[in-house]
Amino acid sequence: MSLPSSCKSTATNQHSTTPSLTEGEIVAGITYYHNRSLTAEQYCTLLEETSLGERRPLAERERIAAMLEHADVLISAWQGERLVGVARSVTDFFYCCYLADLAVSERVQACGIGRELIRQTFHCLQPGCKVILLAAPQAVDYYPKIGFTRHNSAWLMEDVSALR
């Protein structure tokens, strides 16, 4: 089994920007890219325009840069030269994909960009691969509307010192 070429990354974590069937697709004036490089500054600017910015280490630019560099799937949405949305995922591509961040600028929310970012993420996965996410409190009602089902057994440990 192989992955779509636009979704593969090399051993050095330099992501491919080879077009897929939907690469550069313009939907309602928004252009979507698979694994296009983003700077920590671009990403943080977007997150500051969303509720997700409250829960990410925006002051730690090196950490943000590493989060972007090590993402397996990074889908970005652009309105001209302006970054308006990102879906950042960690995955094995075959069984499960953890959608770590789904961010859409509040200026363009309710336009279908989040749904399209998720659809583009699925284009990078093998059939049958599940997408898993933890919803922000403000987004709990959004995900069922677009097809996600609630799962009641998620667990979180923020530091190894909590391990007993």
Protein language model features and the residues they cover:
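A short helix-loop-beta-strand connector motif used in the catalytic cores of GNAT acetyltransferases and
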Residues: 65-76, 129-130, 153
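Intrinsic-disorder-associated, low-complexity terminal segments enriched in Asp/Asn/His/Tyr and depleted
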Residues: 13-15
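Conserved beta-strand in the GNAT
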Residues: 76, 82-91, 96-103
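Short amphipathic alpha-helix that is part of the acyltransferase structural core
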Residues: 4, 17-61, 154, 164
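Conserved active-site alpha-helix within GNAT-family acetyltransferase domains
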Residues: 127-133, 137-163
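Conserved acetyl-CoA pyrophosphate-binding loop and the N-cap/start of the following alpha-helix
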Residues: 108-117
